[in-house]
Amino acid sequence: MVAHAGAISVRLLADRVGLTGELSSALTRRGFAAGHDRGRVLVDVATMITAGGEAIADIDTLRHQAQVLGPVASAPTVWRTLYELTPARLRRMEKARARVRSRVWGLLPDGRPPTATAAGVPLDPDLVVLDVDATLVLAHSEKEGATGTRKKTFGFHPIGVWCDNTTELLALQLRPGNAGSNTVTDHIDVLTAAIAQLPAAHRRQLLVRADGAGASHGLLDWLTGLDAKRGYRVGYSVGFAITEPVRQAICLVPAAAWQVALNADGDVREHADVAELTGLLDPTVLASWPPGMRVIVRREHPHPGAPLTLFEHRDGWRYQAFVTNTESGQLAFLEARHRAHARVEDRIRHAKDTGLGRLPSREYAINQAWLACVTLAADLTAWLRLHALPDSLKTCEPKALRYRLLHVPARLTRGGRRRHLRLPESWPWAVAVLDTFTRVMAIPAPG
């Protein structure tokens, strides 16, 4: 019997798209012959994480499948591999990921990623949407870099960038728990790494979304500079703090200027409106921000128990503002497009269920290497959805995907000089599992 036989499809996918080979080439060291190919080891770790592994010792779940997969590295070898991932090797690893991603996207229809949507409406087919956000990861023991956090917990505060079109986790940076939510250099560094992951042909038309933590002069100036480059269109949609000048501008909005807001599906949202404040703000306030920045505010009747400021208590509305450099479009649509950034919370939750939620080592460098494997696992999951999963499995949460596909058992048989994996006929998703394997094997091997 082979447990978790469905996870073999993830490993096969890594081989078919060329990830294993690219990582092997990137991590080869002259004059050093490793007992286990380092690219294969990292793919096995990513496969283990995708299948639900939380600790390096969980690599034994793949070693159990040696009759199908061949030799699999032991836990000590995995530890050594992660220890060997110096910053220089991590950079080579990221370049390998980018080359593979270019090939994976090239295999999609028309050679482009799925079109992002907002308010139930497709955005520009050429637009790539990047969502940047940070999250807290708790540490339950002393670890290097683990500190007290802003929420009075103990752990780390990594920051990542997700591609909304494909759900890929493009970049992930480990930070101490006391790292700021609005640290400009961290935002710029992780966005630079994320953009470098995109195929060159898809870097020229971007939309960067962030919550209020990204509303810093440095980040918006940097994005404006990218937008000013010839041939580039870089938009942003970033949360904005409700300060006293913003409150004064809200008081100046005529009643007729408020427009109805939209739900995520594009329907009218009751008791919610949007308005633009750009022309109502004190010019001295806007002078310090990049030219072309628009300030848009949304108001909504507060939900029971919602925390309100004194201004909101008095006014009877709850306000949220954001800024964008998009020149055209209805205010309601721009606001709905910004609120679609909330999808990143699902991406973070999935990442925490796929390796991010538990860091294995006391050493900071090894935990950063572990996060690099988490990005590999996220890539493989996203690519599995894009290229192999049938419709019945594409929207599954990680836990459901494991139960239905990755953890299905199979019986290994031999005949005609071939090995066969035989699935239980009673498995409700047996057809979907077979369909997934068939589609993975149909991916053309790298030239």
Where are these regions (language model features)?
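Short secondary-structure boundary/capping segments
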Residues: L85, E144-G148, W222-D227, C251-A257
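An anionic, glycine-rich sequence signature occurring as long contiguous blocks
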Residues: Y232-K352, D435-G447
